[in-house]
């Protein structure tokens, strides 16, 4: 076969975007830096680890990984029930040279990697695993043995969205072959913070290509590089996006937790559809250095986890100022709040919670969602919250008809993407701006153009307004009004609210405009009899699909929102009640 064929070791599920057209013997093995040589053992842990156990693992109360929390995993690690190596060990050996045309891959997978291998050919949540994961896990185990713990997440495996660059053997592609093989001079700041806290970056998650900012006729969770991500509650379920794989991986217990990114809904919406907690931080609370951008005004990096407390643990790690991202200089506190301590079951008591009903009325929401939302309000009221009705976003009707929010993203992308491409120390296809990116995409067959168009880029280039253009500032001021006085901030001030709530699928739009935070928590499920709708092959609505509730707050109010979300979560325990059509069966006990 002519041309480079990228063969990804997708966690036991061996496939690429073109794998269906190729036999296994046709495919060379490539890393981000080139092909592996003959008879080479890929360093996922070829040697046997020597593990010192403090107690008999069979005597341990080891949690099921689909619901395991950071505290439970850390307790097992501390007691010696299992090690970080146990959580990530995998060996992949290339036995016969490719040039002889007979490649045999033997995969020995354990625990999280085994879980990924069980389901990834169906859900495609993870694009690759870190060849150095075992080495890092061993290091964390050795530090633990010597009495050194870097923090409460020491030794826990995490998967991060593939638009977050890492300076290691993994690829960072934003789902596109245009920057496959591109390198930055260092890890993204959030990745550095994860490593410093002792987390094992085990792999990268699939996502909507270019964070859903390429096409108007593509599907959520699709990318040329990773294929089509699907969620786990109904076959071919739309995972939403753009942090699609991060949502699915967290839900299925394919890692302790995941990182996603959001411009408008890209954390909370896939979290909603995968029945997990998603926390979109205030823009500037977490660094975006070496994260593929859309908009400097709206992009943010945040945690996606199975519980509010685990999301709080992860936010604690990644939050903070970074001289390489000037938006973080706006952080108003010298010390990052204790987000984990904010997890208080009584946090709803006495809090004023607003309900902007006009958003539901204007955008519309299925009656079953409204009914379950009203039941959630009743739970909060019973927990001591003061529910304040009709705290409307006064400019929402105008916002819903305005092209300005999209125009801001078009202008930012025309400026921010070239600035990012300029930072690449390796840029294999010489992608320098949106025009060259579009040209590559339209001429590379793996990018599936024109069946998946480039309409968003076409519009941005046609408009030609960058965020440095004099025309930009008046547009931006109007946009800010939609989110500020006419949106969430105005509602909070007028009604003296601690937070506002909406069904999650209605919550992202206004906070996106001003960079304010949201946290989504599982709330319920679409019942039997729900009409099944499709977008191409994906099921966008139907029985069994999760429903979440979004808590929206003031800038820098994550501490308060986490408390409210935690109290609601503990009063409802909605997540464990839902059934999936697919989930992995491998557990820690099975490999000890």
UniProtKB/Swiss-Prot annotation:
Glycosylation sites per record: 120, 217, 326, 430, 528
Signal peptide: 1-21
Pfam family of the protein (one): Amidase
GO cellular component: extracellular region
Alphabetic keyword roster: Glycoprotein, Hydrolase, Secreted, Signal
Recorded superkingdom: Eukaryota
Catalytic residues, chain numbering: 161, 242, 266
EC numbers on record: 3.5.1.-
Subcellular location: Secreted
Positions with a binding annotation for substrate: 242, 263-266
Enzyme kind, highest EC tier: hydrolase
Main localisation: secreted
Family: Belongs to the amidase family.
Protein name: Putative amidase ARB_02965
Species of the source: Arthroderma benhamiae (strain ATCC MYA-4681 / CBS 112371)
């Amino acid at each position: 076969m002519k041309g480079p064929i990228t063969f990804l070791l997708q966690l036991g599920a061996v496939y690429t975007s073109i794998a269906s057209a190729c036999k296994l013997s046709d495919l060379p093995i490539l890393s981000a830096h080139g092909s592996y040589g003959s008879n080479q053992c890929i360093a996922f842990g070829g040697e046997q680890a020597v593990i010192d156990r403090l107690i008999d693992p069979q005597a341990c109360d080891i949690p099921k990984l689909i619901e395991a929390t950071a505290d439970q995993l850390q307790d097992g690690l501390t007691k010696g029930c299992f090690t970080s190596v146990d959580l990530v060990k995998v060996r992949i050996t290339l036995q016969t040279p490719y040039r002889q045309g007979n490649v045999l891959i033997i995969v020995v997978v354990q625990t999280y990697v085994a879980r990924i291998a069980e389901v990834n050919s169906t859900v495609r949540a993870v694009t690759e695993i870190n060849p150095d994961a075992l080495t890092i896990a061993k290091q964390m185990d050795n530090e633990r043995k010597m009495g050194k713990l870097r923090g409460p997440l020491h030794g826990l495996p995490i998967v991060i969205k593939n638009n977050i660059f890492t300076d290691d053997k993994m690829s960072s592609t934003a789902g596109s072959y245009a920057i496959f093989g591109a390198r930055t001079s260092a890890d993204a700041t959030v990745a550095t913070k994860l490593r410093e806290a002792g987390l094992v970056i085990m792999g990268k998650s699939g996502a909507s290509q270019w964070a859903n900012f390429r096409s108007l006729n593509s599907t959520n969770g699709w990318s040329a590089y990773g294929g089509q991500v699907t969620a786990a509650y109904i076959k071919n379920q739309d995972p939403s996006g753009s942090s699609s794989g991060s949502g699915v991986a967290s839900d299925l217990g394919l890692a302790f937790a995941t990182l996603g990114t959001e411009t408008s809904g890209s954390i909370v919406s896939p979290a909603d559809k995968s029945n997990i907690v998603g926390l979109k931080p205030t823009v500037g609370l977490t660094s975006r250095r070496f994260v593929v951008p859309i908009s400097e005004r709206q992009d943010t990096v945040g945690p996606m986890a199975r519980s509010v407390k685990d999301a709080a643990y992860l936010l604690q790690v990644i939050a903070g100022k970074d001289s390489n991202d000037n938006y973080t200089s706006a952080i108003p506190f010298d010390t990052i709040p204790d987000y984990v301590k904010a997890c208080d079951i009584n946090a709803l008591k006495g809090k004023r919670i607003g309900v902007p009903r006009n958003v539901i009325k204007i955008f519309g929401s299925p009656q079953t969602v409204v009914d379950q939302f009203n039941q959630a309000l009743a739970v909060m009221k019973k927990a001591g919250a003061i529910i304040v009705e009709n705290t409307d976003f006064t400019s929402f009707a105008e916002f819903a008809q305005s092209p300005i929010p999209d125009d801001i993203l078009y202008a930012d992308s025309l400026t921010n993407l070239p600035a990012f491409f300029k930072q690449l120390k390796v840029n294999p296809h010489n992608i320098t701006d949106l025009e060259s990116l579009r040209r590559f995409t339209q001429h590379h067959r793996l990018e599936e153009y024109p069946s998946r168009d480039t309409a968003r880029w076409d519009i941005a280039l046609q408009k030609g307004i960058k965020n440095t253009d004099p025309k930009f500032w008046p547009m931006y001021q109007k946009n800010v009004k939609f989110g500020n006085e006419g949106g969430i901030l105005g509602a909070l001030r007028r009604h003296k609210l601690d937070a506002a709530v909406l069904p999650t699928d209605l919550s992202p739009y206004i906070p996106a405009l001003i960079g304010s935070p949201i946290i989504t928590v599982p709330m319920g499920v679409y019942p039997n009899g729900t009409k099944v709708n499709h977008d191409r092959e994906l099921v966008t609505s139907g029985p069994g699909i999760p429903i979440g509730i979004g808590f929206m707050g003031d800038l820098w109010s994550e501490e308060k929102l986490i408390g409210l979300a935690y109290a609601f979560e503990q009063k409802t325990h909605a997540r464990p009640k839902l059934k999936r059509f697919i989930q992995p069966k491998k557990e820690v006990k099975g490999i000890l």
